[in-house]
Amino acid sequence: MTECDVRVDLSGKRALVTGASSGIGAAVASALASNGAMVWVNHPSGATLEAAEAVVTGIVEAGGKAQPIQADVSREADVLKMFATLASKPLDILVNNAGIAHSSPIEALEVDDFDRLMGVHLRGTFLCTRSALKIMYAQNSGRIINTASQLAYIGAPGFSHYTAAKGAILSFTRSLALEIGERPITANCVAPGATMTPILADVPDDILEGIRQNIPAGRIADVEDIVGAYLFLASDAAGHFRGQCLSPNGGDAFL
């Protein structure tokens, strides 16, 4: 993984990144660590432990600090257990990034598949935020960064369930920022455009080329193009950003 060259001072900060065993989550975890934060690399199951450990190993070998931590964020019991592990420690940064994606026309979309996607994206964001806020309120500081998507704004055929979940995360973030109010805790989100992650790895080349042609920057983003937005929102420089959404998308959409 190519290292992001954005630099902020996160020395002494502690961060939890959900869905951090691959893709954007792994890149964000690595970038936070390379800027001084100690990072918990969340992954959902035993099947993803090896990938999470590889992310942790990369961080440690680069001189950073990280630990894997398992929880299926769609399951309340898992989230409560994960945060029980963190409860005695500060939590300065929460990145809600866990997500899944698959395409289906509405008439063929199974209810179980709809519920599972909503559970990981929206329920997971809610559950982790609820637990994190208890820590952040007690310490009177923190950064919450949720992962939405450019598609939440513009839609996409075959992804009605995915765009609905991401749109809900946008609204959740805005209301959360208002609820937090004057406290020195921020809630914002990042809405990436098309990014080369494992989700896009199986997309046929002709479709990827069509996506690329619609991007004024001339290419689909790498994960390193995305993480700068997360680093900024995690930093002290973003203290006056509340309920905002940054969308690194190469000019594909003006949001």
Question: What are the roles of these predicted feature ranges?
Answer:
Residues 134, 178-182, 239:
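Alpha-helical segment proximal to the catalytic Tyr-Lys
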Residues 37-52:
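Conserved glycine-rich Rossmann-like NAD(P)H-binding loop of the short-chain dehydrogenase/reductase
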Residues 129, 165, 173:
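Active-site helix of classical SDR
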Residues 14, 21-22:
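Conserved glycine-rich cofactor-binding loop
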Residues 105-106, 110-118, 200, 211:
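Substrate-binding pocket helix/loop in short-chain dehydrogenase/reductase
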Residues 149:
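Residue(s) in the substrate-gating loop at a strand-loop-helix junction
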Residues 2-6, 154, 214, 230-231, ...:
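Short C-terminal tail/terminal secondary-structure segment
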